């Protein structure tokens, strides 16, 4: 599984995370109603405007993100590996996996 980022508090905060087993780190930015994944970018239909390891950022609505994954553990958003190994949402990923 990949721990994406803490989602206990949504605000104008920034955090970094990296996928387990990955030598690349990804930046996760929290806005008032969205999460932006950058640095490594993402792939698949969930993040159509981002590409792996290009630094392109793509935003996803928090409600949609939680609805698609629907699982938090101890305030951490957990995603099973799927597709590119990231978000598990139709092959989409956040960061380099």
Swiss-Prot record:
Q: Which InterPro entries match?
A: HssA/B-like_chaperone (IPR050533), HssA/B-related (IPR008455)
Q: Give me the disulphide-bonded residues.
A: none
Biological process according to GO: culmination involved in sorocarp development; slug development involved in sorocarp development; sorocarp development
An example of a Pfam family matching this protein is Coiled
Q: What induces it?
A: By exogenous cAMP.
The Swiss-Prot or TrEMBL record describes its family as follows:
Belongs to the hssA/B family.
User: What is the recorded name of this protein?
Assistant: HssA/B-like protein 27
Write the lineage as a comma-separated list: Eukaryota, Amoebozoa, Evosea, Eumycetozoa, Dictyostelia
């Amino acid at each position: 599984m990949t721990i994406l980022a803490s989602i206990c508090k949504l605000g104008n905060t920034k955090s970094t995370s990296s996928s387990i087993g990955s030598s690349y780190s990804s930046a996760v930015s929290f806005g008032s109603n969205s999460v932006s994944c950058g640095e490594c970018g993402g792939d698949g239909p969930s993040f159509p405007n981002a590409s792996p390891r290009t630094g392109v950022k793509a935003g996803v609505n928090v409600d949609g993100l939680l609805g698609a994954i629907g699982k938090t553990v101890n305030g951490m958003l957990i995603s099973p590996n799927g597709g590119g190994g990231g978000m598990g949402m139709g092959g989409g990923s956040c960061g380099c996996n």
